[in-house]
UniProtKB/Swiss-Prot annotation:
It comes from Homo sapiens (Human). Residues 1-40 form the signal peptide. Residues 952-961 have a biased composition (Polar residues). The gene is TMEM131L. Glycans are attached at N343, N439, N522, N593, N709, N846. Expressed in thymocytes. This is Transmembrane protein 131-like. Keywords: Cell membrane, Cytoplasm, Endoplasmic reticulum, Glycoprotein, Membrane, Phosphoprotein, Signal, Transmembrane, Transmembrane helix, Wnt signaling pathway. Belongs to the TMEM131 family. Coiled coil: none annotated. Residues 991-1000, 1304-1331 have a biased composition (Low complexity). The chain crosses the membrane at residues 870-890. Residues 891-1609 are cytoplasmic. It comes from the Eukaryota. One of its GO terms (cellular component) is cytoplasm.
């Protein structure tokens, strides 16, 4: 044996380093040393010497879960395993290497490791993460799922416990890629004290506490934006310091409970509490670092560190412990944690004095303990070497000292035939500080036999440990004996708080079994017939070996050679094999007991499997029924674990297995069949769920088998109970016998006799039933149904009908109310109780009523619940309907009353006007009777379209053509018509416009009367007379009294105290306008048309143009093609008549009249310029300023009116017209359909005006605010009219005539009665302005001359009488203010403004316009001028939006004349009878009644003149004058729907020179209306004979009792 070589010392450290790496897997709180770099050399076995098991460093790398253990003795397998592990292809880590840098010893620091899943279609489950060294720690991360292309993070904690560079690896156990490694490193350094000396660092241990609960203080959450979180930390104490603390103060639950109050500022407190809690846990890390007693103190301390990585502020307010002992001392100061840091902050420290720990409970435990606290394994074999040695040749025994804890005696039994020398005993470096070798003095000579070689003592006391290590012995034979040990802490049997340390030997042979040792185990996973063979063989070997260990003798021999053989005393209790085996069940002896479960329901319970070894373990879990030979296996388990075979069900399939953390909610393929395959890394734990689905009622017991390669077989018991839900209601079971009876005594129904029928009291019977849960399962009744209806039905109702739960053997009362309807004496219904498990319990509700009392009680049964609501709704809607009828009736009555009041007002205005007017020159009554009667005989009377103040005298029964189309509601009362001449014209003008122009003129007239205008202005009407008017020639000695018949609007005088008088003097009676040759087509029926003499003499002085009033008309400052002009600028003046709102634009008329007055201001010296060509007129016209001429002229006119002698216009006041005054119908204006209001002004003005003319005699009464509407319609095709803008007159060639575009309306002054009579009929005579004529008050009449002839006073001497031949003529009176200034298209139905118009806008107040004078139209009316000049009736050119107040004229100065038609009643004349071949681009041209015989007729317009409404057609049309009105709402857009189309009057209106002279001339000019085809979508025709029927019956009947016609008497 000489020459025995001793192995190199490095080989010992090599093996110790390998064991050290294994210890790091368990994360025990033991100081772990870095695997020594100097221990690089492996054990070099000597030749012919036993080779010990050598632990290579690469062998510490763990295999994947898919592979079983690699043979530790096969280098090729080890190398392939290492390559597979370090591939790292499964996950990508960031950063690639984690370096913590320099950290102080004992001070933890944390960093985040990010793991990315690069797979696009699969997810990765991270089962666990652990470190190989004790310096690095990872909080538990069970079942962390990394989605595809997703990432997760781990917090790695570095706690250095020794100086120098520390490098290690993290192992990430994944489900898809196995175990992946990751490199981590750090450097530990000591803290240097102020004296410069290094402190001695005591041993430090790392603990991760468990956060038990987090509670939120609601009071704090409501008052502030912060939340107070109560965090309870539960920590299992597994080190020496905690063990000492535990002995001081802990109870039997083995935990140290701490409560920490934290104030956290939440960014979004509105989140759910769970979200806030999870957010806090994700960013808050709490660790404990326990230290041993230091050199300066005997106290052990536990330091608490907190790391906060979030952004919110955390204030640690308080920390408390729940210890009942006084030995624990807590040091804490409130601290504000920094945010987003990596270093931990120390917040508290716990200390416990050793003196307290040595006394008390520890001593009590020792006194009550009768068995050794340390138990030794009996045998440990030496690993096989090269020599064929029996493993039993060398045996090591561990003797436990009964009275000493943590001390073992190691015995060596030498079976060799020679002696062995033990040279040295050493431990691995990792366990040097935990274990100490005692009683080994040096090399020992050991002959064959049993020898006590040394003692092993556990250096740490009262700590919970779980240690795997080896004790190495070197010998003189070159062999190194390795004694494998497992030392762990276990609770004492007495259940005390102390732990006992157990040392096992020899189990390493089975733990970490390689494929070479178990070649068939992996093949047995298929669960075929070989499975039982493999399991039984391995189990028998393990069991027999344990028996040898248990029954082996222990020899005691001292080292001096004395030999003593003695048997070791047997322990009082035979140790079982179960206690010997390391169990895979975390709780040995656990029985999963499933409570009562309903059929077809599933209940899941979980248990935990744990790998107690330092090597990976493969598990196969399956129910007993799936094992190939369950009976044989149960018999084996009975021997091992003492299982009761009688209670085991071998075939039940009611138990299945599932993972506690399933992958995406699904199980693996094996789990579907109840089989699970798990791979556990060292110390790894997993939860496994057992699903119990009872198939039948009753109890069932079975086993869950755990096949593994560590202990071969393990098991856990399961027990379940299948039960059913069962209810009783009223003591009866559900089904046929479950009848619940309602007892209704007869005395109860006798109350029906005492109840009144009106009381309608509900008779009901209530009964309570007890619902009992007689089954083992808790029942939740989700709903109660009566014949399928929830809670009530068929008279039954369950009170407090809501969901309730019943535990087993509990009950609850329900109340059911029955309300009979007394239709049947026997009522049977079903009551169903539906549970949350969809079980339905059916019972029968049975009610019997006395049959003879049913009729008596049926009377007191109330009606349905909705009956009262139905009647209330009915009454409500009927009341609403009645209220609506009342409102409509009230509105109609108010409308009638307002109409009546307006009529009275107009009568008062008429009377006042007639009283204020002086004597006037009127045509004799004989002329009226002869002429008007002939006219009426031809056409008959009509009450439609009459002017205002003319009462209807006849029903419209004699209407011929379209009478059938009119409303059947035609008034049948007698309508007495006044004598008024009628002016047949298509267009009408608005008195509102006229009044507005008057108001503006009053302010703007600053120019003197004598101021001259350029020639272009004077020639404006020259062409107008040639093209559009038949000039009426007056005798040279025309009487100036003619001026007296022309008056100005009353409201013009209002601005001058309502007494201003203005007289316009005609400078030359011989003024004339040339008339082109051609036949004049009048707007009169053919019977009244007279061919005009073509050789009519011209006026000698000037062409007749409308004479301007005393107030100058304002200029038009507007562009001519601006349809939007009227809407915003024109004030609205609305008056309602017959339900029609009339709106009057006034500003345009103001502008038109202003321009007319400009024309009038031209001196007589410039009259000859009118005879120049049209081209000159056009060119010169645009440059005429106007504003500067206004004020002087106005003042002059006002002065004339004040000083002048007004003649009393002695008009023939007939009785009929007086009656018209009494009517006083309020004027209603029609909405304009043209944007430009052509105001027709007369050049004639009476020299004297009565100073007391009532304001009410004007078109617009200030008292009633009645407004006459002007037509705003202008043909868009007027090129000349488009050149009028900014106060200038632009006159194109041959287009000087003022154009009056038809608004297609027939507002001819029809009375309100006739309008109502014809409302609603297509053939009606009413329109939207059906009462224009009716609503206009009495106004003085005016006459007009063409704008080019500003006739002075010298033209018509005051004494010269004028005789007009009005045989077939219709008066065409036009107000001065009703001539539009410009022509521009406008939207129809423009709104009108209020009567009070602002004067600064150039608008006349509505009451300041003069009404138009009436012109008599009779069958043989002659008006002879003094000089014999014939006066030819001239067709007035269509005036755009012009207004002529005929009715006002009749009631005013022409009181005895019939109310004339007004220009805004032009629509009364059919366009079929008008020829509108000429546009009116010259707004200054004003129509006149005096037309020179030589002036060209406008009916023969030159071909170069564009037609406003179409081409001029001279066709012989029927003698129809369709003075129709329409109530159609579209009349505001297109005018009357009976607007005339293309018919033309071919007759002229000649003047009969033999007409007798009237002393008081009413109409100085009669205008023949030129026809312009208008827009009429319906082409309606109206026979004029409807006006003449009455006149035919009565020869003395006035001209036309219809107000649309005016005749002179």
């Amino acid at each position: 044996m000489a020459g025995l070589r001793r192995p190199q010392p490095g080989c010992y450290c090599r093996t110790a380093a390998a064991v050290n790496l294994l210890l790091g897997v368990f994360q025990v709180l033991l100081p772990c040393c870095r695997p020594g770099g100097a221990q690089g050399q492996a054990i070099e076995p000597l030749p012919n010497v036993v080779e010990l098991w050598q632990a290579e460093e690469g062998e510490l790398l763990l295999p994947t879960q898919g592979d079983s253990e690699e043979g530790l003795e096969e280098p090729s397998q080890e190398q392939s395993f290492s390559d597979k592990l370090f591939s790292g292809k499964g996950l990508h880590f960031q950063p690639s290497v984690l370096d913590f840098g320099i950290q102080f010893l004992g001070h933890p620091v944390a960093k985040i490791l990010h793991a990315y899943n690069p797979s696009r279609d699969s997810e990765v489950v991270v089962n666990s993460v652990f470190a190989a060294a004790g310096h690095f720690h990872v909080p538990p991360v069970p079942c962390r799922v990394i989605p595809a292309m997703g990432k997760t993070s781990f917090r790695i904690i570095f706690l250095p416990t020794e100086e120098g560079s520390i490098e290690s690896s993290l192992f990430i156990n994944t489900s898809s890629y196995g175990v992946l490694s990751y490199h981590v490193s750090g450097i530990g350094t000591r803290r240097i004290s102020t004296e410069g000396s290094a402190k001695q660092l005591p041993n430090a241990y790392f603990l991760l506490p468990k956060v038990q609960s987090i509670q939120l203080s609601q009071m704090q959450a409501e008052t502030t934006n912060t939340s107070l979180l109560q965090v309870q930390l539960e920590c299992s104490l597994h080190n020496k310091v905690c063990q000492q603390l535990k002995g001081c103060y802990l109870e039997s639950d083995d935990v140290l409970r701490l409560q920490m109050s934290i104030m956290v500022t939440m960014e979004n407190f509105s989140k759910e509490f769970e979200e806030n809690t999870q957010h806090l846990l994700d960013h808050l890390s709490i660790v404990y670092v326990a230290t041993d007693e230091s050199e300066t103190s005997d106290d052990s301390a536990v330091n608490m560190y907190i790391l906060h990585s979030g952004n919110s502020l955390i204030w640690i307010q308080d920390i408390r412990h729940f210890s009942q002992r006084d030995a624990l001392s807590l040091q804490f100061e409130p601290v504000l944690l920094p945010t987003s840091t990596t270093n931990f902050t120390k917040i508290a420290s716990f200390t416990c004095k050793a003196t307290s720990c040595d006394s008390g409970i520890i001593e009590d435990v020792k006194k009550t303990t009768h068995t050794p606290t340390l138990k030794a394994c009996l045998f440990s074999s030496v690993a096989q070497g090269y020599f064929r040695m029996d493993s039993s040749a060398t045996q090591f025994h561990i003797e436990t000292h009964e009275n000493t804890s943590g001390l073992w005696s190691i015995w060596y039994r030498n079976h060799f035939d020679r002696s062995v020398v033990l040279n040295d005993v050493f431990l691995s470096k990792e366990t040097k500080h935990m274990l100490k070798i005692l009683n080994f003095t040096g090399p020992l000579f050991l002959p064959p036999g049993c020898w006590n070689i040394f003692s092993l003592k556990l250096a740490v006391k009262d700590i919970a440990i779980n240690l795997f290590t080896n004790v190495f012995l070197t010998t003189n034979i070159g062999a190194i004996f390795a004694i494998p040990l497992q030392i762990y802490s276990a609770p004492t049997k007495e259940g005390s708080l102390g732990f006992e340390v157990i040392a096992h030997c020899g189990m390493h042979y089975f733990m970490g079994k390689s494929k070479a040792g178990n070649p068939n185990w992996n093949g047995s996973l298929s669960l075929d017939q070989s499975t039982w063979n493999v399991d039984s063989e391995l189990a028998n070997k393990l069991y027999e070996r344990w028996k040898k260990y248990k029954n082996g003798d222990v020899c005691k021999r001292n080292v001096l050679g004395t030999t003593r053989f003695a048997h070791l005393k047997k322990s009082k209790e035979s140790e079982s094999f179960v206690f010997f085996l390391p169990r895979l069940i975390a709780e040995p002896g656990l029985m999963l007991n499933f409570s009562a479960t309903a059929l077809r329901s599933r209940m899941i319970k979980y248990f935990v499997v744990q790998n107690p070894s330092s090597w990976p373990v493969s598990l196969q879990l399956l129910p007993l029924s799936l094992y190939p030979k369950p009976e044989a296996l149960v018999h084996l388990l009975h021997r091992w674990f003492g299982t009761d075979m009688q209670m085991i069900n071998f075939t039940t399939g009611e138990f299945q297995l599932t993972e506690a953390c399933p992958y995406l909610g699904t199980h693996s393929e094996e789990s579907r069949f109840g089989i699970l395959h798990l791979h556990l890394q060292p110390l790894e734990m997993k939860r496994v769920g057992v699903v119990f689905t009872p198939a039948d009622y009753g109890k069932v017991t079975s086993l869950i088998l755990i096949r593994n390669n560590l202990t071969v077989i393990d098991m856990i018991g399961v027990e379940g109970f299948g039960a059913r839900e069962l209810l009783k209601v009223g003591g009866r079971l559900p089904g046929a016998g479950g009848s619940l009876r309602f007892k209704v005594p007869e005395s109860t129904l006798m109350d029906c006799r005492r109840q009144l029928k009106d009381s309608k009291q509900i008779l009901s019977i209530t009964k309570n039933f007890k619902v009992e849960n007689i089954g083992p399962l808790p029942i939740t009744v989700s709903s109660l149904k009566i014949n399928g209806y929830n809670c009530q039905g068929y008279g039954f109702e369950v009170l407090d009908c809501h969901q309730f739960s019943l535990d087993p053997n509990t009950s609850r009362d329900i109340s059911i109310v029955f309300t009979p309807d007394f239709t049947s004496s026997w009522v049977i219904r079903d009551l169903s109780l539906v549970t949350a498990a969809d079980l339905e319990f059916r019972f029968t509700l049975n009610v019997t009523l006395p049959h003879h009392l049913l009729p008596l009680c049926a009377d007191v049964v109330p009606g349905p619940s909705w009956e009262e609501s139905f009647w209330r709704l009915t009454v409500f809607f009927v009341s609403l309907s009645l209220l609506g009828v009342i409102l409509i009736a009230f509105q109609q009555a108010q409308y009638i009353l307002m109409e009546f009041m307006k009529t009275r007002q107009r009568q008062n205005a008429s009377s006042s006007s007639q009283q204020n007017n002086g004597p006037m020159d009127v045509i004799s009554p004989h002329s009226y009777k002869s002429n008007c009667k002939n006219f009426l005989d031809t056409y008959g009377p009509s009450d439609k379209g009459r002017g205002k103040n003319c009462l209807p005298v006849n029903t419209p029964q004699s209407r011929i053509q379209n009478a059938a189309k009119r409303s059947p509601a035609t008034y049948g009362h007698s309508q007495k018509k006044h004598k008024c001449s009628v002016y047949y014209s298509k267009h009408k003008t608005s008195t509102a416009a006229a009044s507005s122009t008057s108001t503006t003129t009053e302010e703007k007239q600053t120019s003197p009367l004598g101021s001259s205008l350029p020639a272009a202005k004077e020639d404006i009407c020259t062409d107008a007379m040639r093209e559009n008017w038949i000039s009426l020639r007056y005798a040279s000695g025309i009487n100036v009294n003619l001026q007296k018949n022309l008056t100005l609007p009353k409201n013009l005088l209002n601005k001058e105290e309502n007494t201003l008088k203005n007289t316009i003097v005609f400078s030359n009676p011989s003024s004339e306008c040339s008339m082109k040759e051609g036949i004049q087509t009048c707007m009169f029926p053919k019977e009244t048309d007279i061919k005009t003499s073509e050789n009519t003499a011209e006026f000698k002085e000037r062409e007749l143009c409308p004479l301007k009033t005393s107030k100058k008309l304002p200029e038009n400052h507007l562009p001519r093609n601006s349809p939007q002009y009227h809407q915003p600028d024109l004030p609205e003046i609305s008056r309602k008549n017959n339900g029609n709102n009339q709106q009057v634009p006034v500003k345009n008329e103001v502008d038109h009249c202003e321009n007319l007055k400009k024309v009038d201001t031209k001196p007589s010296s410039e009259k000859k310029i009118h005879k120049t060509s049209r081209e000159d007129m056009f060119s010169e016209k645009q440059d005429i300023p106007f504003v500067e001429q206004e004020d002087p002229y106005r003042k002059k006119k006002l002065q004339e009116k004040r000083e002048g002698n007004l003649q009393n216009l002695n008009w023939s006041k007939s009785r009929t017209c007086r009656k018209n005054k009494k009517r006083g119908v309020a004027p209603v204006s029609r909405p304009p359909e043209q944007s430009d209001l052509k105001l027709v002004c007369s050049d004639f003005e009476r020299s004297e005006l009565s100073s007391d003319i009532n304001v009410r005699s004007w078109c617009i009464q200030e008292s009633t605010r009645e407004v006459c509407k002007a037509d705003a319609e202008i043909a868009s095709s007027l090129p000349a009219a488009q050149r009028e803008a900014e106060g200038y007159y632009q006159k194109p060639e041959k287009k000087c005539v003022d154009k009056f575009c038809s608004d297609s309306s027939s507002d001819c002054g029809s009375s309100s009665g006739s309008v109502r009579a014809s409302r609603g009929s297509w053939g009606s005579w009413s329109s939207t302005s059906s009462s224009d004529g009716d609503k206009k008050p009495m106004v003085d009449a005016q006459h007009f001359l063409p704008a080019g002839d500003s006739v002075s006073q010298n033209d018509f001497p005051s004494e010269a009488p004028i005789s007009l031949n009005l045989s077939h003529n219709i008066c065409n009176p036009m107000t001065v203010n009703s001539l539009p200034q410009y022509a521009e298209p406008s939207c129809p139905s423009l709104p009108a403004g209020p009567t009070g118009v602002e004067e600064d806008k150039g608008l006349y107040s509505p009451g300041d316009l003069w009404p138009t004078p009436p012109v008599c139209v009779t069958s043989s009316l002659n008006c002879t001028l003094e000089n014999g000049v014939p006066c030819v009736i001239q067709e007035s050119a269509p005036v755009h939006n012009s207004f002529i107040d005929w009715s006002a004229t009749c009631e005013g100065q022409f009181s005895s004349a019939y109310c004339p038609l007004e220009l805004n009643d032009y629509n009364a004349f059919p366009e079929e009878n008008m020829n509108y071949a000429n546009g009116f681009p010259c707004p200054a041209d004003v129509q006149t009644d005096f037309i020179d015989h030589n002036s060209q007729s406008t009916w023969n317009t030159p071909p170069n003149m564009p037609a406003a409404w179409g081409h001029a057609s001279f066709i012989s049309s029927p003698p129809y004058l369709t003075s129709t009105r329409s109530l159609s709402p579209m009349s505001g857009l297109f005018g009357s729907i009976w607007a005339p189309q293309s018919d033309v009057y071919e007759n002229c209106c000649p003047i009969n020179p033999t007409t007798e002279h009237s002393t008081h001339m009413e109409n100085q000019a009669v205008v023949c209306k030129e026809y312009y085809p208008g827009f009429n979508p319906f082409r309606a025709y109206m026979n004029l004979d409807i006006w003449t029927t009455t006149a035919n019956r009565n020869a003395n009947f006035p001209l036309s009792r219809d107000s649309s016609y005016c005749g002179n008497v």
